[in-house]
């Protein structure tokens, strides 16, 4: 794996997944989307997809053999999911805090305003997934966005998004660097 050079103040990327339980309910999906925006994440890329069984098994292979593995794989392939590449100064930790604890009972007790605390149903149907490290974020982003070049993003788009101005395009569902006068620059893969 190639090393990606980042400036010390560079934005960090993370993968955020919205699970089938939330995507199936438009009001819940919109509530999660609004939480992403209100917490000042930049949405770099987004896509909605129906996950293939073999891709899901590969993604969760570290959990193979655990008691919840089969249930998790079946659930994650049961309906559409939404994948985001999010950027923020400390995107991984901020997204994990916003999600709340994996276990919904615990989330309701210690982080009731978190996504999982307020919207999660069970430990599997807990609304969201997020990368837990820079290494896993890179791996997970590549799994869902194979045409996305993290290196090229850090070289070309990150400085523009970090230094602003930034425009959110509701039609595209992503943030783009805006030129003076409000015209946005094309967002390249």
From Swiss-Prot:
Where do the annotations place ATP binding? 19, 68, 96, 102, 116, 126
Q: Does the keyword Cytoplasm apply?
A: no
Q: Which GO terms describe its cellular component?
A: mitochondrial inner membrane; mitochondrial matrix; mitochondrion
Q: Where does the source fall among the domains of life?
A: Eukaryota
Reaction equation(s) it catalyzes: a 2'-deoxyribonucleoside 5'-diphosphate + ATP = a 2'-deoxyribonucleoside 5'-triphosphate + ADP; a ribonucleoside 5'-diphosphate + ATP = a ribonucleoside 5'-triphosphate + ADP
Keywords of this protein's UniProt record, alphabetized? ATP-binding, Kinase, Magnesium, Metal-binding, Nucleotide metabolism, Nucleotide-binding, Transferase
Q: Which GO terms describe its molecular function?
A: ATP binding; metal ion binding; nucleoside diphosphate kinase activity
Catalytic residues at 129 (pros-phosphohistidine intermediate)
* Spans through the membrane: none
Cofactor(s) recorded for this entry are: Mg(2+)
Top enzyme class of this protein? transferase
Give the Enzyme Commission number.
2.7.4.6
Entries under InterPro entries matching the protein: NDK-like_dom (IPR034907), NDK-like_dom_sf (IPR036850), NDPk6 (IPR037994), Nucleoside_diP_kinase (IPR001564), Nucleoside_diP_kinase_AS (IPR023005)
According to its UniProt entry, one GO biological process term is:
negative regulation of cell growth
Give the matching Gene3D superfamilies.
Nucleoside diphosphate kinase-like domain (3.30.70.141)
| Similarity comment: family membership | Belongs to the NDK family.
Q: Which CDD domains match?
A: NDPk6 (cd04414)
The protein's role, per its UniProt record: Major role in the synthesis of nucleoside triphosphates other than ATP. The ATP gamma phosphate is transferred to the NDP beta phosphate via a ping-pong mechanism, using a phosphorylated active-site intermediate.
> Is ATP-binding tagged as a keyword?
yes
Q: Which gene encodes it?
A: Nme6
PROSITE patterns cross-referenced by the UniProt entry:
NDPK, NDPK_LIKE
Q: By what name is this protein known?
A: Nucleoside diphosphate kinase 6
């Amino acid at each position: 794996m190639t090393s990606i050079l980042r400036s010390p103040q560079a934005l960090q990327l993370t993968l955020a997944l919205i699970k089938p339980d939330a995507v199936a309910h438009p009001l819940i999906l919109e509530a999660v989307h609004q939480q992403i925006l209100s917490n000042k994440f930049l949405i770099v890329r987004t896509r909605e997809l129906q996950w293939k069984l073999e891709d899901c098994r590969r993604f969760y292979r570290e959990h193979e053999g655990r008691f919840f593995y089969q249930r998790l794989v079946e659930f994650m392939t049961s309906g559409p999911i939404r994948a985001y590449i999010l950027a923020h100064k400390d995107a991984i930790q901020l997204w994990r805090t916003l999600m709340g604890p994996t276990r919904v009972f615990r989330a309701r007790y210690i982080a009731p305003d978190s996504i999982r605390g307020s919207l999660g149903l069970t430990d599997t149907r807990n609304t969201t997934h997020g990368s837990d490290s820079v290494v896993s974020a890179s791996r997970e982003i590549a799994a869902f966005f194979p045409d996305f070049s993290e290196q090229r993003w850090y070289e070309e788009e990150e400085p523009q998004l970090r230094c602003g101005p930034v425009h959110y395009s509701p039609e595209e569902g992503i943030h783009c660097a805006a030129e003076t006068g409000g015209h946005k620059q094309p967002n390249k893969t």
